[in-house]
């Protein structure tokens, strides 16, 4: 049935996230306003809520909310026997089961919205809509060339450090393995460094005791202290043996892939949005204060630009305003705490 979305509100349980992308990008639906019952539940039943009366929930999935707020019961998806199947492969019985499953979900979402809307501030509905549009109707333009250049630089720097370490450790061994396995030298070194067991063996080979710590899961057991946050591992990066220090620093680089991941995510996101980059945020995502929290590549927490150029600068510097607009940058120290103190007083 045709619907005039220009004067309608599209409400879904994950409409401020995945569902809105499907609706807008795959189905071409552009409603007058977006509503999200999951977002509303996060705000209304957060630990610090002051306008509802303080019921805290164990989660905001449709199943949990429907049960805890007594608006109905969600059906069992497993019973539809459709998991892992494409629609084209559904039997008639499976299509009928899925139709019933979806009808119940839709009915639960409608009941949930009617429950949550009571006492819910109208301006917060506007913020949920705004948050959703920052995702599905992005305005920031990405300078993809700048991001791609930074990504190449990061990968080349890692590769160079791994090759240098391979030479220091004995390139002949790795070269022989390369001929046998077809694996590149840098990939072999990467594997040696990424594995705690293999890195421990490397330390032993270099005459350095493997640092140990009490196992976080079993206090009676000791385990290698080789995580990037372990003080003993951090100390290895300034070891008197330069080979040990180099290996420790290279292991840290291998384990730290956040920058590469974010740069790649920027490129992928812009590729599917005609060169523009979505800003995915979770409304009321912070458990204590109820502020927005970062999603995906966390646009709320991009690395600062320091006095010396770094590849991570590309994350901020690649963001461009659309034609006719400017980006105004503002960053205040301790702003979350200060805003909450202000709200507490008023």
Describe the role of every protein-language-model region.
Residues 57, 67-68, 81-314, 320-326, ...:
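Conserved "right-hand" nucleotidyltransferase catalytic core of DNA-directed polymerases
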Residues 28, 319-320:
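Short, conserved catalytic or adaptor-binding loops enriched in Gly and charged residues
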Residues 29-30, 119, 172, 346:
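Secondary-structure transition/capping motifs at alpha-helix termini
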Residues 16-28, 42-46, 198-207, 333-346:
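Short active-site loop/helix that positions an aromatic residue
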Residues 1-2, 336:
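Metal-dependent nuclease catalytic cores that hydrolyze phosphodiester bonds in DNA/RNA
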Residues 11, 34-35, 142, 327-331:
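Short hydrophobic beta-strand that contains or immediately precedes a catalytic carboxylate
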Residues 2-7, 321-322:
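Flexible, charged surface loops at secondary-structure boundaries
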Residues 7-117, 124, 128:
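Active-site-proximal helix-loop-helix substrate-binding element of RNase H-like nuclease domains
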């Amino acid at each position: 049935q045709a619907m005039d979305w220009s004067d309608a509100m599209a409400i879904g349980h994950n409409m401020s996230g995945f569902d809105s992308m499907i609706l807008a990008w795959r189905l071409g639906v552009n409603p007058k306003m977006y509503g999200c019952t999951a977002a509303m539940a996060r705000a209304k039943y957060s630990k610090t809520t002051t306008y509802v009366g303080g019921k805290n929930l164990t989660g905001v999935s449709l199943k949990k909310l429907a049960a805890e707020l007594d608006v109905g019961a969600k059906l069992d998806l497993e019973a539809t026997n459709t998991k892992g199947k494409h629609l084209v492969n559904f039997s008639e019985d499976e299509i009928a089961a899925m139709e019933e499953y979806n009808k119940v979900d839709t009915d639960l979402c409608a009941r949930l919205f009617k429950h949550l809307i009571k006492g819910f501030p109208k301006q917060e509905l506007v913020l949920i809509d705004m948050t959703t549009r920052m995702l599905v109707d992005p305005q920031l333009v990405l300078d993809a060339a700048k991001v791609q250049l930074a990504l190449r630089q990061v990968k080349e720097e890692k590769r160079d450090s791994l090759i240098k370490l391979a030479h220091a450790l004995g390139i002949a061994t790795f070269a022989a393995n390369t001929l046998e396995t077809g694996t590149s030298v840098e990939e072999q070194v990467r594997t040696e460094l990424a594995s705690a067991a293999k890195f421990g063996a490397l330390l032993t080979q270099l005459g350095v005791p493997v640092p140990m710590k009490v196992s976080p899961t079993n206090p009676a057991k000791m385990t290698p202290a080789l995580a990037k946050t372990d003080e003993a591992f951090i100390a290895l990066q300034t070891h008197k043996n330069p080979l040990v220090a180099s290996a420790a620093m290279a292991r840290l680089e291998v384990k730290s892939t956040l920058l590469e991941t974010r740069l790649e995510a920027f490129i992928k996101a812009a590729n599917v949005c005609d060169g523009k980059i979505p800003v995915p945020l979770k409304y009321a995502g912070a458990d204590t204060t109820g502020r927005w929290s970062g999603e995906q590549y966390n646009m709320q927490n991009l690395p600062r630009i320091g006095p010396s150029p770094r590849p991570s600068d590309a994350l901020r510097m690649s963001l461009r305003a659309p034609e006719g607009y400017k980006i105004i940058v503002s960053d205040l120290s301790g702003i979350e705490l200060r805003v909450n103190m202000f709200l507490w007083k008023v």
